Amino acid sequence: MQLQLICEDAALQPYLDAIASKWQLTHDADSHFALVLTFERLELRKLDEPKLGAIYVDLAGGAVAHRRKFGGGKGQAIAKAAGLNKGATPTVLDGTAGLGRDAFVLASLGCKVQMVERNPVVAALLDDGLTRAKKDDEIGAWVSERMSLLHASSHDALAALASDAEFVRPDVVYLDPMYPHPENKKKTALVKKEMRVFQSLVGADTDADALLTPALALATKRVVVKRPDYAEWLDGVKPSMAIETKKNRFDVYVNASMS
C-alpha cells in the first residue's frame, strides 16, 4: 500500500523502514495520507484535513482504559454476546480487528484473542499499539499473554484457518465490519473522525457478507457480529439471538452451547 512515510526524527528511520518492510508499505509523496513515526508512537494523519488530528492505538490510556475500569465488566453487551456471562472464558478470533478496542475489552475480561486485520496501515497501527501496551506496567503482562495479531484478509484467513488441521479453532469468531454511516446518525467525535479517515483510506466493507460462512465454519461455539442498530443482518442470515444497545446490536449465531 502506498502513502507518505514520515519520521519526526532521522534517528527513527531504521524503525520506520522495518515497519514499512513488515507491512509492505511504500512511500508515495503525493498521498494525502501519512504514516508518521514519532518518539512516542506510530500515527496516521490525513494531511489535507489537519484538523482531524492523528489516529493511533492507545490501549493503556484514554477512553480504552476508562472502559476497562468502568465499562461494566462481564455485564456489558459485548461480553454477554461472546458468552462470558455463562461463566465461560472463551477463546476469540476477532476477524475485523481495526484499532483493537473490542478485542482489548474481551482480553481484559480474560479471553485469549487473536486479531486479524487485512488493511496493512491499520495493522501497522495496531501492531505498534500492541507493542507499547505489552510494555505497560499495569496491563503489559496480560496483554502479552492474551492478545496476538495476524495480518491477513479475514476472508482468506478464516477459510484457511478452518481447513488447517494444526490450528486450534476458537470458541468465538467476532466480526465488526465497517458499515456506511448515515449523516443523520450521531457518533462521538473520535469515532466519527476515525470512520471518516478509515472509509477514505480503506472504504466500506462491501464484501463483508462473505465473512459469515467461513466464520461459522471456524467458530466452535458461536459467531458474534456487531452491527449498527439500523443495519440489516450480515449476509441476510437471521441470528440465533441479538443483544441490543442504544446504538448497536450484537447478532449472535450459535453453533454450540458455551458450556
From Swiss-Prot:
Reactions catalysed, as given in the entry: guanosine(1516) in 16S rRNA + S-adenosyl-L-methionine = N(2)-methylguanosine(1516) in 16S rRNA + S-adenosyl-L-homocysteine + H(+)
Name of the molecule in the record: Ribosomal RNA small subunit methyltransferase J
Function (record text): Specifically methylates the guanosine in position 1516 of 16S rRNA.
Major subcellular site: cytoplasm
Residues holding S-adenosyl-L-methionine: 101-102, 117-118, 153-154, 176
Cell location: Cytoplasm
InterPro entries recorded: 16SrRNA_methylTrfase_J (IPR007536), SAM-dependent_MTases_sf (IPR029063)
EC primary class: transferase
HAMAP family linked: 16SrRNA_methyltr_J
Stated family: Belongs to the methyltransferase superfamily. RsmJ family.
Keywords: Cytoplasm, Methyltransferase, rRNA processing, S-adenosyl-L-methionine, Transferase
GO molecular function, one term: rRNA (guanine-N2-)-methyltransferase activity
High-level lineage: Bacteria, Pseudomonadati, Pseudomonadota, Gammaproteobacteria, Vibrionales
Enzyme Commission identifier(s): 2.1.1.242
Superkingdom of the source species: Bacteria
Native organism: Vibrio vulnificus (strain CMCP6)
Gene Ontology, cellular component aspect: cytoplasm
Disulfide bridge map: none
